[in-house]
């Protein structure tokens, strides 16, 4: 195909728009979804996850995160133009139609559903509330005072699904990890919301940063503390090897650095602090990986 032909240019433009809707150029959301899923897979499989299961969760996570981003932009299409960080998104620029976004969301969800084929029926069953949470979260910002809590539930469902896929059951340690991840998500997404707080107040969007008001930093740190405490409880429940416990002082240091950074409440610093949570996910994965190695 001639790269200068109208058809090629049209297809290139659509592909660019769809990839931007999916946040394909911003992998942080996928990583923050993958880390807890990997924690669960490694714990449930004693450090040796089945490759087919690992591939299904990795690809499925990318697809569902992408679908969530598309439906989020659809839900926020009337607001994104008024927010500094989102004013260049496809809907805000008038580059995409509502029908296109809905069809793309459906297509991505269909592809994600195909990833369930090699998994057991319990995992299929648990995918239904996960799908519901992922697709409805963007609309909670209109009426729920802490939508980040709802997002935490959506971002944590990969954990019980992973345990279900490996062992065909969801033991107590899965729910401890689930609750810990809800708190971690609430912490880092509140920091994310702090970056948009001024704009959200103007347009009337509800976020945890708006709801917590001047206590937003305290709320973030309480959630971080609860997350780390529950990870310690999890370690005790599973009889974690020494390597697991090395993560706690490292994570506490990273959390303190986040506290020192967000005290300024500067928009860009809050956004960079949100991105830094990828390190916490990586540290805990490394600790869990090492635990499964040394516990054998």
UniProtKB/Swiss-Prot annotation:
PROSITE patterns: UBIA. Keywords: Cell inner membrane, Cell membrane, Magnesium, Membrane, Transferase, Transmembrane, Transmembrane helix, Ubiquinone biosynthesis. It is found in: Cell inner membrane. Gene3D superfamilies: UbiA prenyltransferase. One of its GO terms (molecular function) is 4-hydroxybenzoate polyprenyltransferase activity. One of its GO terms (biological process) is ubiquinone biosynthetic process. Its EC number is 2.5.1.39. The chain crosses the membrane at residues 28-48, 51-71, 102-122, 143-163, 174-194, 212-232, 233-253, 274-294. Its cofactor is Mg(2+). Pathway: Cofactor biosynthesis; ubiquinone biosynthesis. One of its GO terms (cellular component) is plasma membrane. It comes from the Bacteria. InterPro entries: HB_polyprenyltransferase-like, Prenyltransferase, UbiA_prenyltransferase, UbiA_prenylTrfase_CS, UbiA_sf. It is an enzyme of class 2 (transferase). It is a multi-pass membrane protein. Pfam families: UbiA (PF01040). It catalyses: all-trans-octaprenyl diphosphate + 4-hydroxybenzoate = 4-hydroxy-3-(all-trans-octaprenyl)benzoate + diphosphate. Belongs to the UbiA prenyltransferase family. Catalyzes the prenylation of para-hydroxybenzoate (PHB) with an all-trans polyprenyl group. Mediates the second step in the final reaction sequence of ubiquinone-8 (UQ-8) biosynthesis, which is the condensation of the polyisoprenoid side chain with PHB, generating the first membrane-bound Q intermediate 3-octaprenyl-4-hydroxybenzoate. This is 4-hydroxybenzoate octaprenyltransferase. It comes from Neisseria meningitidis serogroup C / serotype 2a (strain ATCC 700532 / DSM 15464 / FAM18). The lineage of its organism: Bacteria, Pseudomonadati, Pseudomonadota, Betaproteobacteria, Neisseriales.
């Amino acid at each position: 195909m001639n790269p200068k032909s109208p058809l090629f240019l049209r297809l290139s433009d659509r592909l660019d728009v769809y990839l931007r809707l999916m946040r394909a150029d911003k992998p942080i959301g996928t990583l923050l979804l993958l880390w807890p899923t990997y924690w669960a897979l490694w714990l449930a499989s004693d450090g040796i996850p089945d490759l087919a299961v690992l591939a299904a969760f990795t690809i499925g996570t990318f697809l569902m995160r992408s679908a969530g981003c598309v439906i989020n932009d659809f839900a926020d299409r009337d607001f994104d133009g008024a927010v500094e960080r989102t004013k260049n998104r496809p809907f805000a620029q008038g580059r995409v139609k509502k029908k296109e976004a809905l069809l793309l969301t459906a297509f991505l969800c269909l592809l994600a559903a195909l990833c369930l084929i090699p998994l057991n029926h319990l995992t299929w069953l648990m995918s239904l509330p996960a799908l519901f949470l992922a697709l409805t979260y963007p609309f909670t910002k209109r009426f729920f005072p802490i939508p980040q809590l709802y997002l935490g539930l959506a971002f944590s469902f990969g954990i019980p699904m992973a345990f279900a896929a490996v062992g065909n059951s969801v033991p107590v340690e899965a729910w401890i990890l689930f609750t810990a991840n809800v708190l971690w998500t609430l912490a880092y997404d509140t920091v994310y919301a702090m970056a948009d707080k001024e704009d959200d107040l103007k347009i009337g969007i509800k976020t945890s940063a708006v709801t917590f008001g001047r206590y937003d930093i305290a709320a973030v740190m309480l959630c971080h503390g609860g997350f780390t405490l529950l990870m310690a409880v999890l370690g005790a429940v599973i009889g974690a090897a020494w390597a697991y416990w090395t993560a706690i002082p490292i994570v506490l240091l990273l959390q303190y650095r986040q506290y020192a950074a967000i005290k300024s409440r500067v928009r860009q610093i809050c956004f960079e602090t949100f991105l830094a949570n990828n390190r916490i996910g990586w540290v805990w994965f490394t600790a869990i990986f090492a635990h499964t190695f040394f516990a054998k």
